[in-house]
Each structure stands twice: as structure tokens, then as C-alpha cells.
Amino acid sequence: MVEEILSLGFESLELSHGIRSSQLEGVLQARERHKFSVSSVHNFLPMPVEVLTDSPDCYEFTSHRAKDRDRAMRLTLSSIDWAEKLGAPFVVVHTGRIRSLNLTAPLRKMVEQGKIYSREFIKRKLEAVQAREKVAEIYTARILEFLGEAVAHAGKRGVKLGIENREYYEAVPSEREFPDFLQRLDAAHTGYWHDFGHAQIKHNLGLIDHAQHLEKMAPRLIGCHIHDTRPPFRDHCPPFTGETPFDQLVPLLPQKCATVLEMSPRTEAADIVKAVSEWHQKFK
């Protein structure tokens, strides 16, 4: 996989979840051979040995099980250590979700049925907001209780944690909560990681305004995952093949923001090369 990515002309790449411990030695050898840089590490790296398939949310800081929250912490500390070893400045982190609520799936179904402007949809969305607001702080407190140790460890290793926005409304923090959430973490070692596809999905659900959210988060933005979304919810598509308004959004990024192309494994190499070429023409 590394060889294939480099063959497309990339000189830097993100090492993501799904890489096993047994594969990391090969990655290190390829890095020594090709001298590529690692832009970021995505939690959890390496993949937990007890997990059989790629699952970045297999352990969450929001879990009601203390042992799962502790496991999430240990795995995050390991990811930070690997980031330092690989010279990666960032670790992208999922902070968890409210598993007891089922909010996003019903809203998605109604959008797919063309009901986004119906009274029924508005009623369901308001109910989702109210249900989430009742319990959100409980889960936020769980995250912060454990995340503080990871932030301190990242500081010692010279690494920043990028807290990523997610595509479902059960995620913690929500877009509304993000500014306050980050204020409760050390700004020297944490920041916001913007996923364009996830934000566009939330936009298509009527939960956020993509541009307004990105503009609001710009002061804490340290990196982003770039991919497009085809209506209404198919993300990880090459840029400029969906409906994400990159021409409007990219100028909102701070100058020193890390940018990582995050494609579906099914994406054809030629489509990636075409998207990168167009991106450079527009934004470089």
C-alpha cells in the first residue's frame, strides 16, 4: 500500500488505523528506503491485537465500561509514541459517541426519502437535539477525565492531538460543543481536525452549516481530511466529484493547516491523480 501511494507522486502520508503491529516493521523499512515523511498518525496505531477487523471506534472514551475507557487511553498513548518515532507532528483522535442514543439513522432515512423540509423531519430533528442535550455533559466529562493524560503525554513527545469531527450526531463533542470542549484542553498540545466529508454529511442532514462551522473552528484548526461527499451521504470520494463546496471552504483554512487526502480504498488511482492535479491548480 505504501509503495502504491508513493508511486502516485505523494511524498508524505498518514498512517491510519487498521495497520497491525506485524506490519509496522515493513512500514519503517519502506520509510527508510523511500525517505517519505509521515504527516500524521490516526488513532489507534497499531491496531489492537484483539480486534480482528479495522475498527477505529472499537474502544471509546465515552464507554460506560471503565476498562474500555482505560484501553482507549493505553492505545492512544501507544499511538502518540509511534507518532514521535515516525516524526509525525499529529495524532488524529476520535473521542467517542453516545451509544445509548439512535439519532442519526432515522434522520438519514428521512433525508433519503426526500423529507428534509417536512414537519415530520423538523420534529424528529428537534427531538434528537433535546435527547442529546440531556446527556451530553456526562459523556464529555468521561472523555476529559481520560484525555488529559493523553494530552500531557503528547506534550512530552512533541506531538499534537487533533480532535476530529464525526459524521453522526451521537458523536461527542458535537459541532456546537467543539469550541468549549477544546477550551478545556491545553491549546499547546491539542487542536481541531476537520473532516470535510463528515461535516458535509452533517450539513446535508440540516444539523450544521459547513462553512459557518469551519470558520468558527479556524483558530484551533491544525489539520484536515480531504474527501468529497456525493449526495446525500456517500463520502470518501475524490475532491470535485461530489457536492462539497471546496471553493468556498478551502480559503477558510489557516495557512499552516495540515491537509491529508482520505480516499475510499475503492478509488481508482487515475481519479486520485486527477483530483490532486485539480486541487493544486485551484489552491496552490
Identify the meaning behind each predicted range.
Residues S12, S40, G162-E164, W193, ...:
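Generic enzyme active-site microenvironment
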Residues S55-P56, F121-E127, H225-R230:
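Short, basic/glycine-rich phosphate-binding loops at helix/coil junctions
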Residues H42-M47, H94-R99, E167, R230, ...:
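Short, flexible active-site-adjacent loop segments at beta-strand->alpha-helix junctions, enriched
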Residues F61-G191:
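Active-site acidic/histidine proton-transfer and metal-coordination neighborhood
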Residues M1-S79, E84-A88, L107-E120, S277-H280, ...:
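N-terminal pre-domain/capping segments
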Residues M1-L6, S21, E32-H34, S78-V92, ...:
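Histidine-acidic metal/acid-base catalytic patches
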Residues L15, E60, N165-Y169, I201, ...:
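Conserved short-loop catalytic and cofactor-binding motifs
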